[in-house]
């Protein structure tokens, strides 16, 4: 897999993958236009959206409507020196009262299959190089 990163002006940096563009920008207070999520926002959103696709698939397989199902992702942080560090990611699956109770724990288990979560739990090695072409 290859993702091409391009610079499109100002503080905008895009990722191009499989013919699609994922735009990023920085907030105005950091010199950007605030026209797109930051790379870190995309990273955090990838956790919730990955969990979401597993919940969606689970419900589709059982013909359960997702019209009133949502996920909420929240975070706990801690100040360490001059930095704020992410210490906990909280995912809540909000289901309507008629959602079958027998599937409550199954939703948690299916979210544990999320590839993004698995990658965070077992981080890869990074190999960063400068190449002159």
Q: Across the structure, where does each feature detected by a protein language model lie?
A:
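Extended beta-strand/beta-hairpin segments
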Residues: 1-45, 56-133
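Alpha-helical metal-binding/catalytic segments enriched in His/Glu/Asp
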Residues: 50-51
